[in-house]
Amino acid sequence: MNQASNFNLREEIKEYWSMRAATFDEQPGHEIFSEAERSAWHTLFERHFGKGDGRKALDLASGTGVISHLMHDLGFNVTGMDWSEAMLEKARAKSRQRGSKITFLLGDAENTIEADNSYDVIVTRHLVWTLVDPAAAFAEWFRVLKPGGKLLVVDGDFVSPTWATKFNKAMAGFLETLGLRKPVEAIPQMQTHQDILARVHFSNGARADAVEAMLRQTGFDPIAVDFDLKRIHSAQKKHISFAKGLERGAQHRYAICAQKLLET
């Protein structure tokens, strides 16, 4: 993909997420819908980062500030960055309402323009699978992390069909044949999303081993891959349909913690 194509795709992605901002928090898996889920996220972050103790954290593609607030709960000095002003407006309003001292910046996760060695930790949720140039993004994140700092990537393969997606599709077709279910009409937003995802780097799905290998090539070491996200997903399932819950449980989801070595 050439530079011009990259630019056009990135603009499409920015426009898409700006369009989604108004309803983003209504969907389970975006906003937190229970204290059980909040606690599960806190546990994940503490497992890899420890307590905040005023350390500087950067939440990339921060959206409406969900992860930023979870990190703030743990005592981190949080900066959220997103390239959608519509998302940032939601995040700032939420921060004012909750009285949280979080800085929200308009910026690009692949080119943050932040100073070298400026953050103790970086966190991303469901960003990597949508990146146009993940190698460039990882190099940028490595640059802005302090020596000894940690990156936590929470992501998954949301593209490859699983047994659950195949089962749900077959059941939907069967029920439609019996006249017990109306055919689902295509949603324009969903088609736009699919068109975009067909052109990103991980268009066939962001598998943990591929992301880990790319992080290692960037210079991160050590790297730990964590598949123990059951508490988060169990809490989310209580707020979605049975079919969606099956799909979510069958997906390849993970958290990868990667460290920037201390300078010697």
Where are these regions (language model features)?
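Conserved class I S-adenosyl-L-methionine
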Residues: 1-53, 66, 70, 150-181, 229-231
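Class I SAM-dependent methyltransferase SAM/SAH-binding core
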Residues: 56-60, 64-111
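A short acidic, Gly/Pro-enriched loop at the edge of an enzyme's catalytic core
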Residues: 110-121
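A short SAM/SAH-binding and catalytic strip from SAM-dependent methyltransferases
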Residues: 121-134
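A short glycine-rich, Lys/Arg-flanked "PGG" loop and its adjoining helix->strand segment in the class I
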Residues: 135-147
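Short alpha-helix
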Residues: 201-219, 225
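Core SAM-dependent methyltransferase catalytic element
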Residues: 218-221, 238-264
